[in-house]
Amino acid sequence: MAQIDIRQVRKSYGKTPTLHGVDLSFDSGEFVVILGPSGCGKSTLLRMIAGLEEITSGEIAIGGRVVNTLEPRERGCAMVFQNYALYPHMSVAANIGYALKVAGVPKAERQRRIEETAKIVGLSDYLERKPAALSGGQRQRVAMARAIIREPAVFLFDEPLSNLDAKLRVSMRAEIRKLHQRLSATSIFVTHDQVEAMTLADRLVVMNKGNVEQVGHPLDIYHRPASTFVASFIGSPAMNLFTTKVEVETPAVILSGTPVKLFPETALELRGRNVTVGIRPEQCVVSMDGPGVPAIVDFVEELGSGRIVHADIAGETFSAAIGEDLLVKPGQRIHLDLPTAHLHFFDPATGKRIETEGTAETARSKNETLLAV
């Protein structure tokens, strides 16, 4: 296990900057997921930790030792790639033990560690097979076994599940998590898949355009996104966002001519300002003729475990989770009630979160009081 410290790390390709002064610290034994869209710099950062990319400026330290000038083999890291990169002419056992063979580990010791590692990842019965005779999930296990056998201080995962089908991704997520609990090694996992991020991470790093947008526990980030980017990137469907002006007298914001109530403290703090308001689809309350903002149904997604209605409000699409008892179809008029306690506020100019007396836990507690009256 090793702590990783990233200090003001920048990366440029010629005159094109890719990473803009990244500052991060990962605790020893922590499982960190770096999440972001394609091109955000997450894989570049991982490759810089591994030593596969040069650092333009800044420092990376592993276990208290600055590794900027160290070769990849000297950093104590093992990497698992999206592409398994197995030797097709070698058996599973030979693939797993190849690094030990190159390092000159005696044959008996090498065989013992191959068998122990194969047992950890459930490949004991496949050691004599070639990669072509394995499923995608089994090949990924070989790739992980090849990393485990080196007994590294740090595991680096670069989108290792992207080539697997949906069912295999679920089972491999569980295997990776159990593996981490067993080995307790510091692990950094890069992905663009928010489900992988939410289910695997002890701590989540959200990146966008070479910058770190937010760092925290996955649920903290989900419930308190630091920006409109995080709010729209985390969650499926994404958070509903609309920009409007705060009315003090009501107190409310107006959406398509309909007031959406605010707590008085919120209205006073934000009075007269344009704000971007957000609410998660599962926190909208949908009815056919109840209170709320009128909307026209565009389409309904049947997910088996639930249903999502997508509706038009003044030319903007809003999403809301609905139960099986509410039957709606395209073209129908519905009403979306947006509970005060679940509203989020952002600065339209910067996209950054605005904290007020009427948001988050304070708002929820006040809402419970209002409902009790």
Curated annotation (Swiss-Prot):
Residues 4-234 form the ABC transporter domain. Disulfide bonds: none annotated. SMART domains: AAA. It is a peripheral membrane protein. It is found in: Cell inner membrane. Part of the ABC transporter complex UgpBAEC involved in sn-glycerol-3-phosphate (G3P) import. Responsible for energy coupling to the transport system. This is sn-glycerol-3-phosphate import ATP-binding protein UgpC 2. It comes from Agrobacterium fabrum (strain C58 / ATCC 33970) (Agrobacterium tumefaciens (strain C58)).
